[in-house]
Amino acid sequence: MSPAQIIRTPHSFPPSFTGTSSSAENSHAQSPQQVLTRAFVASGELNAAFGRTSTASEQDFTSLLGTLQRELERKTLSFPDIAELANQLAEAAKGDQGGHWLGRDEQQTLKGMIDRCKSQLAHTHASDASYDPLAQVCENLKTARLHQSISQMTGEAHAKVRGVPDLLALIQLDPDVLAEKPVGMTSYVNFGSFICMAKARTAELSEDLRSDPNEVALLLHPHADTILELERLPDALAALTENCPDTPTRDDLRSLAKETGELLQQLRANDLLPRSEEVSSYQGETSVRSREVVEPKLTLCQAGGNGQGQLEASSARPESLRYAPTRAASSGSEARVPGQAVGGKIADDAQKVAGLYAEKKRTNWTQANGVAGKISHKIQSLLGMRDAGSRVQAFVAFMADGKGRPGATMLDLGDGWMRATRVIKGEAALIDFQCDSDGKVVDARHPGRFPVLPQGNEREAFKTVLQELKFRGAETLSKVPVYYVNRNTRGYVIPTHGYVVAGHPNRGRKSGAVLYGVGGDPKRGPVALDEKLLGHLVGRSDSKTSSKLSAPVKAAISALAGASFATREDFYDAYCAVRGDAVDPLERHNEISSIYRLLPLSTMEMWPKKADDYRVARPAAPERDLRAFENLPKDIGRKAQLKKVSNVDSIDLLEAKRQFTLHQLYQDEMLGRNGTGVPSADFKPKVDAQRRDQLVASTPKFQRLPPHTTDKVGNCNTGASSLLQRAVDTYTEKNNLPPEKVTAASIFGIGSSHRLAIWDPLDGSSSNKSSKDR
């Protein structure tokens, strides 16, 4: 929306439009907010909601900010000129400005200007000629600040708080547009996908605030003024839900509203939003006394010889992290440790503190020595005397004090900067710190996962690079752990369902975990309409299954009684022939899809499973399996047991799955199918009936419970253990180790002792070692 045309009143939602906007409404023209809402609903893209562009702006944000600051410092102010500059600044913020405009200096300058203009507006009478231009200046500056925060929170370093921009986007929408059913908007699929993604990110952010509030707070505190807009989110979601005509999207909006309520509670609990009794002070935007929202002052306080220290009482209070007088923005503190000194510049950039804290957490470094030290630290944390900032202070002091110590290297980067590497519990920690002429540490940072070497000092950097390769390289190239997982599924109490995952458990969606599961495929398998299957599909009138099929469908199935089809595609053609061309093709397709869902598991072939799109609200079983590993269930009704398998390589596990998938692809090509259960002109059978029967006989079938009499039947545990067993056998043979038999993670992993034959279509053989040989 164009900030120059909008004036937000303290209690209005949505914002009212002035002048040209009202005339546009009278002439049935679209307001800027309606245009952006239509574009966003159609595309589902975040930038569309804010009117942002990916192209670079003609105006440079930093230079405009400096010009506007100088104009505000003049003795005689020209508010129309200032309003025009503020409008240009807001427009520049919508384009790609690079990363320089997201620095702390630019953020503090912009927030200071907003605070100054709001204070002056509060002291200006509404009848004054300067009131309207000044109000536009405030609105445009707030718009620029919003885009500044959005740009930073959508960056890779702020991935944990990515849900906040999504929620802010929903506040910008005009809910009436949804009710109008605009021309050309035939579907709400993209909008619904965005809502589902926002809900998932909101839930993840709430969980991170519960499990690790310090790290998330460090990312959100610099944007405390922006996230205050989230107070309007419940009303915005209620309006969108009321006006949305699409039922699935409306249900997703209700679910998002529930997740949002939990998030707002967590934000208030961590003093990132005002408490309920303070909300009224936020709504009154024109208060005389203004307070500047600043980052928490994570100063580096006095540290003893062992690196321990205490925080000042003022910095330990949560309320001091959200609000501080304007003069506090430039305050800092310094302290010394023997041989080194730690200064307060690190506190000036919350992103630096977050990076250093993440490095400390990665290496599990702690000051505590023994049980007594850990108890002391726990008591200090409960009393508010230890937070992320204080731990970063001690960590920087520890790293800077490593010169000349075993397992530590120092590399001169120039301009007082040093790169320090120290071995901590078998892992190499890496930071950069800067010293002044007195040897006092005045700044520190984490150089990133792949730090750049200083130009001209490549030869001197050899020792440090060698140390990093020795520890960090080994860590980066270490083999991926493999876990056998058993969990309970819907309707079951005990964890009988089994599968294998390569990755690190309980690390969320971005952990990179890979699912290696085998299960029944409802779109692949024969259909034999014998008496048993007919009774299951048609059955009695009071049968639960038969009641799900209409009378014409039952009649068509009965007409095919006794027939046997090698593939689902053959059954599809026969069913369509019985139903005739008078029936709509889409209706016939839906009928057959319903039949496929009701076919017994015993008619399904066993193939590797694939995880679906993680953004969907109701994922299929493979995606639920992966989610249970990435976020271990905490509910009492959900159980997941893990067993780490040591003698296996994830690459061998991948090869085993590829071998199984090769069998699937070969069989699909020979039988003329594409995995959808629907015949296609592009896929025609390439074998005769005799060869087809041989292929079908070599295909493993799903059988839930033992006894599994042959290596061509099994369940999910059988498939998972077969893949894992093949990978373990490959690993033990390569490393001359004794054979090892794979077992499930739970005693309820029924079928894990049985093995499937993984057939190789290239030579016609199967890996059908008996489980007794292992």
UniProtKB/Swiss-Prot annotation:
The answer, when asked if Secreted is one of the entry's keywords, is yes
Q: What Pfam families does the database record attribute to this sequence?
A: HopW1-1
Q: Which GO terms describe its biological process?
A: biological process involved in interaction with host; symbiont-mediated perturbation of host programmed cell death
Does the keyword Cell membrane feature in the UniProt annotation?
no
Q: Which InterPro entries match?
A: T3SS_HopW1-1/HolPsyAE (IPR029378)
Instruction: Kindly state which keywords UniProt assigns to this record, in alphabetical order.
Output: Hypersensitive response elicitation, Plasmid, Secreted
Chain intervals with Polar residues compositional bias = 24-33
Q: Where in the cell is it found?
A: Secreted
Region (Disordered) location? 1-33, 301-340
Primary site of residence:
secreted
What domain of life is recorded for the organism? Bacteria
Ranges of Low complexity composition bias in the record: 9-23
Gene Ontology CC entries for this record? extracellular region
Q: Which cysteines are joined by disulfide bonds?
A: none
Q: How does it assemble?
A: Interacts (via C-terminus) with Arabidopsis WIN1, WIN2 and WIN3.
Family recorded in the similarity comment: Belongs to the HopW family.
Entry function: Induces hypersensitive response (HR).
Q: What is this protein called?
A: Effector protein hopW1-1
User: What species was this sequence derived from?
Assistant: Pseudomonas syringae pv. maculicola
